[in-house]
Amino acid sequence: MLSSKRPVRTLIAAALALAALPAMAADPAFNRTVFFGDSLTDSGYFRPLLPPSVQPVTGKFTTNPAWVWAEHVADYYGTNATPNGNGQSGDNYAAGGATVATDLVGALGPTPSLKTQAARYLAANGGKADGNALYTVWGGPNDLFGITNPAQAPAVIGAAVTNQIGIVGSLQAAGAKYVMVPNLPDIGLTPMARAGGPAAMAQYTAVATAYNNALYGGLTQAGIEFIPLDTFTILREIVASPTTYGFRNVTDMACTSASSVTCNPTSLVAPDAATAYVFADGVHPSAATHQMLGQYAVSVLEAPRLQQVLTHSAQTIGHSRADQVSLHLGGAPADGLSWWGGVRGDMQRYDHADLYDGLAPAGLFGIDWARDGMVVGGFAGYGRMDADFGNSQGDFTQSDTTVGLFAGWYGERAWVNGQVSYSWLDYDVTRKVHLGPATREHKGSPEGSNLTAALNAGYEFGQEGSFRHGPVAAVIWQKVKLDGYLESNPSSTALGYSDQDADSTVGRLGWQARLDGGSIKPYVQVTYDHEFEDRQDGSAFLQSLPGVGSYRVPGLKFDKDYATAILGARMELFGLQSNIGLSATTMQKKAMDTSIFASFSGAF
């Protein structure tokens, strides 16, 4: 005859095996990065036309062989920013010297405009754009450089802006959802402009400003959604405080060659010029400046997603709290008034902590009144989470104060209980933006709430000695609200956020087993959990561009299907009824939520 303990041992072993499986969290925001632009984005369009002997250390308009900003962005997302053109087939179509809409023939050969670049991309992809890709359309400087008379400026700017808006519109019409449109940097700060004196500097600043206002104003008026990038302001900030960012020269060129396309380590004005100078030549950024532009772009793209960590962490804590409330009774209680209290330690770790990880101790206290298997009661609790965003992107604390109601019915074999609770959420958030050797901190203290409702039920089949087992089911619904707020330290990297609503509806089906005899009564529950709500895009707005409005990026994508294993034991401890256990989610990708809990109860 089989021991009655063997089935529960088997289920416990299965639960432990599930908990040991590796898990995954949020996927990268974009599956592809496609760039259209000029020399500011060009990652080597003309390199095949240069002498083979120098190709490894030339071909970009910077302090070669450094990366341009687009390559830094692509590297972050694990995508492609290699050149497309002159026999190359990457996703960076940008070509040095390109205007917005007019194809040219330059010193290095034919130069396709941004309009032609985008048309070639669409033609190569069946006229369709990838809705999960990031597109960048950055142009305009070469159109401005073609102005020979100030009177031409309005017409030139108007034509270029109209065509650039048309490019963005055509990409979105083809299916693109996320198009980044950087504005022009302050050309008046370049060595080329400085060579013309204060009047030339002012003139170039004025035309860049006019272009930027027309571009963003036109996109907004046309109702076209886009992701802005304020390169105009960030370049000003770098030039205004060069030592903060590791520079010692903001006025001169790092390269001795006439054009940075042939600049290489042997043609620098100093061995460290690639990192000590802001500009490579008369108009193009150095290696260090490109790195900072890439870091800036990534910060703008990722910050809205970090805000979704705040709502997700609240939902995860709410889930653990709902489980603890549901499990505080192991069966029909004695008639009368009783109390219960519990402590819990939640650990959240996502993407091996590259997304975020944190610890959240919490406490609960409740009072129940029971008669003939019916139970009603209330509870209250408090918890605090200290967490770090991954990749040194900052940290946050989250506190929750909760009140709730509980009701249940416990029969000989079946049981059902329900609860509803409301939590007041308070956050202190620090987001860090790394720009070369400098780190900016932006802080905020938003408030929020979590309305939770849960229904749990189970049934136990016959009895084999002291062994009981049967199916369980549950639904946990949560609505988390996060108030909008403005980050501190207003600058090009500071963002603002509108109110967020994050809904979660988790359905759960599984099996439970327990041993009812003896002084220690172990139990195990293993369930398949499914999240019914779809992810939402993240959104934010740049404080330095108040008239542009909010932009959207893909939201964090958490697993919709996973397993939860709960292992515990009920016993009498210090004269009190006790429930001590561990809960862990698994079968996720690079993610695990773990909770250690202990509850105690007694009669009044």
Regions found by a protein language model. Give the residues of each.
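Conserved active-site regions of diverse hydrolases
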Residues: A25-G336, V343-D351, E572
